[in-house]
Amino acid sequence: MKFAFFTLGCKVNLFETQALSQLAQARGHEIVDKDADAVIVNTCTVTSVSDHKNIRAFHKLRRDNPNAVIAACGCFAQTDPERVRATGEIDLICGTRDRAQVIDLCEQAVSGQAVQVHESEDSGFETLPAGIPHGRTRALLKIEDGCNNFCTYCIIPYARGRVRSLPVEQALGQTARLADAGVHEIVLTGIEIASYGKDFEPQVPLTELLEKLLTAQPNVQFRLGSLDPRAVDDVFCERLAGFANLARHFHLSLQSGCDTVLRRMNRHYTSEEFYRCVERLRRAFPDCSVTTDLIVGFPGETEDEFTQTLAFLERCAFASVHVFPYSVREGTKAAAMPGQLDQQTKTARAERAKQVAKTLSAAYRKQFVGRTLYALPEHPTGGLWAAHGRYGFPVYIEDKAEKNHPVTVKVIGLHKDGVLAKFEN
């Protein structure tokens, strides 16, 4: 059989799609880009815009694969299966539980068998194979799924369920296999990785897992996905600062720099508590890259509250800020809040925040000019080699490099969203 895969959304979805692709290949199936017998769409529902992207993807995939069995899994399929079904394009709907069954179901449907999709109970973490995807230099490893935080703007806890974690021994085994396969960098991802191990009895803190992984694979660089700032306590910093193979890039989810907005969002920290986490990281990991996400135009956000957020961005001196204008997500508390802002105001505030973020990013990267950095080349682009470094920003190398072979380069300037570098003579 020929399988095709299409992914929307986050790194967790990307990992899960890669895992399903590996499962299909292990059964002898061919992975193709077109003329597939079965197409698996991994959907996203983080915003209403995401839902529309899913539906457009369904229609396009059906046009491109008129005779294929098309299966939808993921968050949109989990939260709104009736809407998925109403498109008339999808043959199988599987949601976010028991992902591996979707391969079985596609095989049955293509062979003409009657298919019954069983709604799986939330029975724990579903372990899927980790592997380096074709054409990439880094591997993703999902260590956690689900979220217990219930921010007022977010539908994901309803799509993904409660926190579930990959057992430590399985994490060690998967990273060992990736290292043996020649992977130089592993990105640890999940829906809310700061909650890793809270479902275990006794609980296993994220810090403990990281210590074991970093110790077991000293020649592999580990990078963390998005972190709730509450994970960055003194223990986290004291126990991990000595590991050279932990990337000096920490993405802390902020969302707003104004305390009144944070309370409306049901974020469980204040701006001052967040700032102390940033300072803690910089003391433990000098020159580390601290990046963040920001939602502007949240319901009820005043000009003064927005101005407080801009000032807080500058105070934290983030290396990069992903700015999003608030998008109404039906089914969340925020969607019913008073004080919904018009799109023009939200767009204007997003542009102002992006300008601040652009200035901060350039200021952070300038400090590396003249310094020597580690880089992992990934692909050629525009006469340069694009590479990943330890600090979160891209490294563009002037000289010819070899993919997936770590190098040491000297930074000679800024380039696009990263730095320009060359081999030292």
Residue ranges and their predicted role:
Residues 100, 149, 161, 194, ...:
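Glycine-centered loop/turn positions within well-structured domains
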Residues 336-425:
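Terminal RNA-binding accessory module
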Residues 262-265, 333-337:
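Short acidic, glycine/proline-rich loop/turn micro-motifs
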Residues 134-137, 147-149, 246, 256, ...:
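Short flexible coil/turn linkers enriched for glycine and charged/polar residues
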Residues 70-71, 79, 180-303, 314:
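Conserved SAM/AdoMet-binding glycine-rich loop
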Residues 1-196, 235, 246, 250, ...:
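Proteins enriched for Cys/Gly/acidic motifs involved in redox and nucleic-acid/cofactor modification
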Residues 190, 226, 254-256, 292-296, ...:
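Active-site proximal loops enriched in glycine and acidic residues that flank catalytic Cys/His/Asp
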Residues 40, 75, 102, 188, ...:
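Residue-level signal for inorganic ion chemistry
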